[in-house]
């Protein structure tokens, strides 16, 4: 009985503590009542279940540990990225087989990133404003299926084989000066393919004889122009009679024979031999000739389909990322565990499709000449598999729960709590007894962020991020193009995809330790050096299969560099502007960088070739590495200390860095105070801003779609403009350089309040105030004067 009472008291204390922390807008450290567990809270994938473990089998315990909401996200990522990986890496090769040049192929691949960069924020705002997230998601998935299938049903252009022959010569019969009724016998003893110079002296009697013989097929005093592309050989009946080394007739003086190449068969009324035309084909089949008018028409048609389809299909992955982050709640650092299933599906689908296409390659017969185009790839298999997998992803997408009511309820509770904290102060005859007035410590604006990023140190980091995105887009578009020129197969492409995605996953989950070990800037050095080695190695390839060792560097050149850039900028800017900084970085790296890599790289490939372009980008990477290291050496004199400081600011998901926050709360008293105007309340922070200011959350997560932060950036700017128009100017009190807090009025006789806030020595130089953390908040003392009480959270 005593134990039950203790348990009840413990539950009541926990409930009171939770309400007390929510009132002051502090992050609740998962203090929940055991009797009333929340229904919509999703703690993690590995939360223990209350069922008895000894009565369940291993498989049952495994299924019980998996959250159902996050299981939907995992399955969606698996099938969506499996569909994407089965088709889109091969689209450049499909365009090449349709007869397009590298410029056209690069434009069709790269324009997707620019359209997605513009349309994803638009659809995100529409879905949030009208609360139609699920409808927009399903419509976007349907557009993925229809418009990508439309690319596959485009009728290919007409192809014609180019005829090539081995040059041969035709031996004209040796003519002797005989009467017109005598038979001409050809000299068929010579089988040499060499042509001999005509004897001008011996040519004159020939012309006389041919002109005097009216039965001859040659026109007198005229020579027929020789065709350089056609060749003639003696007739088969003439070849059958070549049993003697030299066949002659009863003539007086034989003249030397000549080699004349004609385009018409020779025939006479006498018994003469006629030559027939025979062609000799090259065993190496030439590439087919495309009808360029049809190729250009197909290019414009596919370009129109991509522009329309990508505009409507762009918000799909953005909305799913948002829902998944909502499922995770405060455990956003586990986003990588959900997104990794997409990388797994991409690699496996690409490998299977590559093997399947290799085993179903056909020899295309063109025209009546039966010109065979070897190793003609049937890419319709990829389109069919893409459609099937995307339909499955569409079915899975119907299971997402857009809990708008619960989200609105939480926002309403937050507003209600803030109104409860404010209402007693404005009511007549009432006095605030336990609620302090919180004044925002410091307010940062978007232009402050732009002024920071335009500095030499951070602008060079942004340029490196753009260049790495440029290289990633070029490799995604033209690596398989180059390997196919080296007789690489689609099976090789699948193996390359598996290796690159495995290396990216390993790099994502070890990036924190890697950055902490060497520092942010040195990670960028290593990424540029690996880019140089990789591109130069690819440019000198002679065997396509030797590219496999360099595909392991994809994790360093993409994943590690991406994580280092996000972490570096996140630690440099204050938390209220962290989302804006990440949106700018993602737009430069994944939007503008990848798009320029595909489009500009296609122009370079069209003019210089694939290998030469790889070599040029590799040398450019080396030059940028040298310039970047020189700039960092000049601007960052204490680089080692700064990198160590930034690495320490990255909280580890398993053991976040504890940060002590001391709140100075003024209690009530019966001492009367003179009346004074009430201070203006600060602007209400949105839920997203509160999540961004939470220092217990990691500075970066492996992002699956870059447009989530871009949409939030646009929405945040719009919200700032509306708030600035709606509310009057709020007087903001800056942080004090000393520990003394000034009173709000000269008439206030309350003693000064001293703060013992803990300052973080590892805060990087940026927009943050010199007195401490940018999220530090001061509680202004009220009119009631009593000793302040300290609350540590």
Curated annotation (Swiss-Prot):
Q: Does the keyword Magnesium apply?
A: no
SUPFAM superfamilies of this UniProt entry?
MFS general substrate transporter (SSF103473)
Q: What is its main location?
A: membrane
Compartment(s)? Membrane
Q: Which GO terms describe its biological process?
A: antigen processing and presentation of exogenous peptide antigen via MHC class I
Low complexity: which segments have biased composition?
Answer: 170-179, 241-283
What the record says about family reads:
Belongs to the major facilitator superfamily. MFSD6 family.
Protein name as it appears in the record: Major facilitator superfamily domain-containing protein 6-A
| Species in which this protein is naturally found | Danio rerio (Zebrafish)
